[in-house]
Each structure stands twice: as structure tokens, then as C-alpha cells.
Amino acid sequence: MSFETFNFTAAINKAITESGYKDPTEIQQKSIPEILLNKHILASAQTGTGKTAAFVLPILELLLQDKNKVRGPRVLIVSPTRELANQITDSVKKYARHTNINSATVVGGMSYKLQNKLLSKPLDILIATPGRLLDLFKQGKIKFKDTKIMVLDEADKMLDMGFVPDIRKIFNATTKQQQMLMFSATLDKSVSKIASEFLTNPLTISIKPDTKGHSN
């Protein structure tokens, strides 16, 4: 299988080529077509298997297909730590660089003034840590009525760090009609339980830990 199988737009294919990717990794082969079909996904994949691209690439494609003009954010990506959120931000910028899709990141440690400025403009993709996202929502700086896709990345880590109550509050503030994507290094009972709360009839994808791929 090659990336051409997914029929991405030329702008995304150009970014994939420039990133040096030849063939999609296993998590990408299994996730991308299903995400493009707007399915809810519960996926288990280790870091280094290309899981970030597995959700970012099809999300960008779906955004390009949606011509509706809204304030956004149209996509919400929640990550447990500032470091992981910044890594996702780098990937989004890399894959979207030949498009007009814009993104912003709100995490702990950044000034509220800067983040408020980022949120004052129409936004396609918002990448955030749970605590800061919830703070900004409570302040009325973010609304989720336009959110069509929500990603919970590193779900097992968010569980370990005690973020589930925050995630629940954020989820309850959405329309609950959005496509839900949940990625985790493990799929134990606690992760599956949380998934059952947020996802509707999800397709479960599990990639063995020894599967290797490109880093993003």
C-alpha cells in the first residue's frame, strides 16, 4: 500500500513526499481510511509507529473537503502534556504547510494574553492540554459548537495523570455529535471504559508494540 491509495489532495501529498515518507505504517494503513469515513476510532499504538500522522493527515483532508466557513475550532486535539501537544503542533504545521488550514496551541506555561490573542481569530485546529483548555472554556474564550472532530491522544497517560474529569467536562461542552478519535499506547480495561463513555460504536485498532515506522 502507498499513500496514493488514500487519494489525498495534492497539497497533502506534497507535504507527505517532502517529509520523506514512502509507504504508510500499519497504524496509518488501518486508521486513515476509517477516519476519512468519519468513523469513531479507538486505536492502540506506541510512539514511533507514525500514529500522529495517522490522525492528522486524514483530519486535514476532511477539513479541506468541508467548505463551510465557521469560527471554529473545527478540530480539537487534546494531549496530556505541553511537550506532546507541541509535538502534535509541529506535525500539523508540517503536513498543512501547503494548505490554508490554520492551527493554534494552548497549554500550561503560556501566557493567557498570547493564548487569548490566538483564540480571537477563526480557527481550524486547536491543540491543547486539558487543564488550560478547560480554564479558557470557563473564561468564555473557547466555544465548541463548530467542533466536528475531537482527538484524545495518549489516553492512557491522561488517565494516569487524572485528567478524565477535565476531559469529561470538555466533552460535555461539545455538541457530542463530533467524530471521536482516541489513541492510546495501551488498551486496558480502564482505557476501554473511558472510550465507551466518549466514543460511539468505535472501530478498535491495535498495533503490536514491535511495529516500527517513521517517527510522526
What are these model-derived regions, one by one?
Residues 5, 11-14, 18-21, 68-138, ...:
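Conserved nucleic-acid-binding Ia/Ib motif block in the N-terminal RecA-like helicase ATPase lobe
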Residues 24-27, 33-34, 58, 73, ...:
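Proline-centered helix-kink/hinge sites
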Residues 45-49:
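The conserved Walker
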Residues 1-44:
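Conserved pre-motif I regulatory segment
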Residues 29-41, 52-69, 86, 91-95, ...:
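Walker A/P-loop NTP-binding motif
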